[in-house]
Amino acid sequence: LDLVREMAMAQEENGARILDINMGMNGIDEKEMMKQVIYEVSSTVDCPLCIDTSHIDVMEEALRIYPGRALINSISLESEKIEKMLPIAKKYGAMFVLLPLSDEGLPKDGEEKKHIIETVYDRAMEMGMAHEDIVVDGLVATIGANPEAARECYETIAYCKDVRKLPTICGLSNISFGLPERMYVNTAFLTMAICEGLTMAIANPSQELLMNAAFASDMLLHRPDSDIRYIERMNRLAEQKAEYETVVVKKTPAESTGQKESSGADAIDAIKDHPIFTAV
């Protein structure tokens, strides 16, 4: 699990605030692997974890061993989810992502989506959970299939922010599925969603354009300490670029003496000694 630890540290260093843990792969024991990864990641980084599984037994075991307050991804109005996942969330004091789906599948329109959000919210309150336990998924679809997908998601985000006073989350990559140069679409979607009140996004923090846009958007909206965070990020990126350029132009002993045979080994040594590189 060395790779898992390395990825977790890299994600945190690049700005992730929560790490989503999903072990839903063919050919593995999901419950056992989920336990191992939670142990490794929670002891490696400071970020809280989001437990991402559709299996009830895996979710309960993950919450049982996690040394903190986790975020469940996700609970919907689907019968099995709301009847079994909500009690587990309450039992272990977890927060949860409210996914506006029902047994009928995707909501037909914005009004049905609001109805699902309200119904799941009310059920959670009846069970004794708190308002602060819930994060609503904007449920964004791909614009390749629905040209109004982005607008519908923005309306859900605004409704949760202005009417329900609930934080929101969405998966960025969904919006651009099947399109060329997806990063530009994802970045534009993110900045507009932040303006509507989006709280969190499921994304890869190593994507520099995306993260820079998020930090800049927060600053333009005058969110607390956003100016300091933006400046600190830009300074860190500038330092990394300067260090990278220093490594690239530095001559190795073999290059200085014309000994081409050993220059490959010298280059790998230089990369190994540099903090932002990993030799493969």
State what each model feature region is.
Residues 1-24, 34, 40-43, 59-132, ...:
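ATP-dependent carboxylate/acyl-activation modules
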Residues 27:
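Residue-level signal for the "D+5" position in two-component response regulator receiver
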Residues 48-49:
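Metallocofactor- and cofactor-centric catalytic cores in central/energy metabolism, strongly enriched
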Residues 55:
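A generic "binding-loop/recognition-motif" signal
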